[in-house]
Amino acid sequence: MDIKVTLTQNKKEKPDYSNLPFGVYYTDHMFEWDYTEGIGWHDPRIVPFHNLEMSPCSMVLHYGQTTFEGLKAYLGKDGEIRLFRPELNMERLNISNERLVIPKFNVEDGVEA
């Protein structure tokens, strides 16, 4: 998978890593991946964090359609990032998505993204 990366020009101030409350600090970037009927998932990209724009007809607004991606990443003492069972996480996400009529994605692509 070829993921296009666009880096932000406005980096946020880094928080105190010894005091990180949940849901207060956000990354400088976000992952986006388009879906088109008949084509499937395409154009994966990492872009600067921004507000989302969506149609008033979006299913999520009418039916509360959402799934939670709970992948955990840890920084090792050697400076390497460790992911905890990413393949199983992506498989669970696909199962949840299927229940809400959200199209499945390739698990390997999800892990790479």
Regions found by a protein language model. Give the residues of each.
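Conserved alpha/beta cores of soluble small-molecule-handling proteins
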Residues: 1-113
